[in-house]
């Protein structure tokens, strides 16, 4: 592996603000000092308002703290939209996100691929495939070829994003990576990740589809999650032990299989603290022997 597994939060924890901090430029040194975290995901989920100048300042602060930056593109991207104008707007959200991510020095852009919207899933996937390749081509032409689109598994069966759908799209281009959101996988299948064997089956499928070297580079999200009959309801925190999945089951597998991508915690409000718990679980797995 070219690097070890990087671990960090999606956005700033409530604790960050409670301790008097306001600017994300302060977050990287803060999380390094308190928790030893070396990754951070910038949330553009509800829209892009950041300037390139601000992105540059964020990137400088992250580099000074040796924290890897990733970003999450807007949630409302739908590359499967049958309306060409709306699909083109979604593509622009991705290229705009990539422009800011590049200014921050990051390379991993998490993407929700979209929803069928009255089409068959097969038709929607075909549209997604075509438009993902168009976005990739645009990034290369804009000298942003280092940006890797990380296609996310989703928590509701009504949208595109089953593991098999994501893997089929990732195989389209060598720069694409899966974003394995284990909470979403758990929720979309009615609580499917209950044992270490369940997690192993997910990783086995990824490795079979992409090969072990590329699977090891996967971008990953983790939290506990509340779900219902239609899938995901809301992300939960690690102390909400009545909800799964349990990271202690996954940690030994990531260590024994040599995963070295990025692992982001999406707990609600305690993402830095829970990311630190994940980092500690990985350290215990390394120290205590591999399962």
What are these regions (language model features)?
Residues 18-29, 51-59, 120-140, 156-174, ...:
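Distinct, well-ordered alpha-helical segments
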Residues 1-2, 27-36, 50-70, 96-105, ...:
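Acidic (Asp/Glu)-rich catalytic clusters
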Residues 63-64, 80-180:
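Active-site acidic/histidine proton-transfer and metal-coordination neighborhood
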Residues 1-96, 288-291:
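N-terminal pre-domain/capping segments
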Residues 10-14, 43-47, 74-78, 114-116, ...:
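Active-site beta-loop-alpha junctions enriched in small/polar residues
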Residues 271-288:
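C-terminal helical cap(s) of enzyme catalytic domains, especially alpha/beta-barrels
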Residues 5-12, 38-42, 69-73, 109-111, ...:
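Hydrophobic faces of well-ordered beta-strands that scaffold small-molecule active sites
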Residues 134-232, 236:
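Acidic/histidine-rich catalytic cores of soluble enzymes
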